[in-house]
Amino acid sequence: MMWRRISAVLCVVALFAVFTATASAVKYVALGDSYSSGTGTRTFYEPTCQRSVYAYPYLLHNAHPEWTFVNATCAGAKTGDVLNTQVTSVTSDTTWVTYTIGGNDAGFSSVITECAQPSWASNCEGAINTAQSYITNTLPGRLDLVNNAIKSRAPSAKVIVLDYPRLLNGTDCNALTFFSGSEMTRLNQTADMLKNVESAAATRAGANFVFRDVIPPFIGHAVCDGGGGSSTEWINGLSNPTGESYHPKVTGHASGYYPVVKGVTG
């Protein structure tokens, strides 16, 4: 009789252990472009894709080291890269997914490069018009493909969709750039357009998709806020190497992106 009681207790303990392990098994997959990989932080543990320990995905990983973490982010990524390469990291046991995507599809870095030149040497307005047309007419369908691919691979995963900050504050403090006030206004309006399109796509994707806007926390911390290169800036201005330009700094991830993500995941 005693042996049976001991066996029963051991079985209960074993079942509890299995249940606890299953319940606590969390997998987090980070997808997306340079705003998720950490370009702009200037320190990369994986240089090809410019993945940084200071980027918000790695900060979330540090907060939950018990989670399985897969970082599939890569600088320069477009929606096609997510669909063809990155999304394979999302499996049926995935709990959380985060991403920023769409800026490269719209050619936003090329737009910034064009607009940074003197007006007589560039066609900033034309570049912005082309980007905005893409955002309005083509990007929604591309985002739907990304979201559907994630859903098909991990129907139960919670997906946090993030946008991009407004980069400019209306003042050009960099000696080698030539943004006009109207150009900066339109560039920031383009970030707002991206936000609206990404938010709508997340809504279409269903209840497991949550859109979070990073524009509010970055207000007051754009390029040239506090003067070029100041600690008030959370975004790099024109930088060396130039690929780091107009991307969130370490503080941009720690104080801008990460709190927004952490507010959802806990």
What are these regions (language model features)?
Residues 1-25:
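Secretory targeting and sorting signals
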Residues 17-29, 82-99, 144-156, 261-265:
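Short amphipathic alpha-helices and their capping/turn segments at secondary-structure boundaries
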Residues 24-73, 88, 117-119:
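Serine-esterase "nucleophile elbow" of acetyl-processing enzymes
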Residues 27-38, 68-73, 95-100, 105-107, ...:
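Structural recognition of the beta-strand scaffold that forms the well-ordered cores
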Residues 39, 81-135, 166-168:
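Oxyanion-hole/transition-state-stabilizing segment in secreted/luminal serine hydrolases
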Residues 46-54, 121-138, 182-192:
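A short acidic, glycine-rich active-site loop
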Residues 61-67, 141-160, 190-212:
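A structural motif corresponding to the C-terminal end of an alpha-helix
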Residues 165-266:
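Catalytic His-Asp segment of secreted/periplasmic serine-dependent ester chemistry enzymes
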